[in-house]
Amino acid sequence: LYIYQMTRYYSNIVGKYVAQVTSAIKKLSGLEIKLICPSHGLIWRKDIAKVVSLYSTWAQLLPEEEGVVIVYGSMYGNTAKMAEIIGRELNAQGIKEVKIYDASKTDHSFIVAEIWKYKGLVIGSCAHNNSVYPKVQPLLHKLENYGLKNRYLGIFGTMMWSGGGVRGIEAFANGLKGIEVIAEPVEVKGTPKVEDVARLENIARELAAKLIAERN
């Protein structure tokens, strides 16, 4: 539980300063550290090496575990349905850790912490004023600001007229180095149809194949 809170604090507060963290770890590498006394949190008297190792991993923006975070914004429930379809297929393909979050209901600090932990990320948004849904946009801004990398990304969303949600997520992905977009983004008009389900499941299958291929 406390490790999770460490991840949440690091990813949301320290995440932008990866270069400084890496530099500090190198400077301290020759010292025998007996205590870690952070300005926020518990004092560490043991497991020092584990704490330093975690910070080193986080500073490199390396995922800790195999798994996928699916986060979406939905006005009428259609984008939420798409998220569930992808999540179920990921489970069916053998990915056990699949976390699905509604960006309108879960505080983004918790979502960011989970994204820091897992290699797979799938983001979905309905179109809103020719752009990304307002509850998803701040999350994209945070991840862009932190320079997220070393992740596989799937993209999906819904539209009725000119779209904009999927287009906005694609622009976000194009602005980041070290993010690999998996499969073709899926944009659906209204509620997902049978053919749309197949395309969504394809995102899940391709993402699962990438993750499984990296198993030791």
Language-model segments: residues:
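A short acidic (Asp/Glu
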Residues: I48-A49, K81, V166
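Flexible, glycine-rich phosphate/dinucleotide-binding loops
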Residues: G77, D107, S162
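Short N-terminal or domain-adjacent regulatory/targeting segments
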Residues: L35-E64
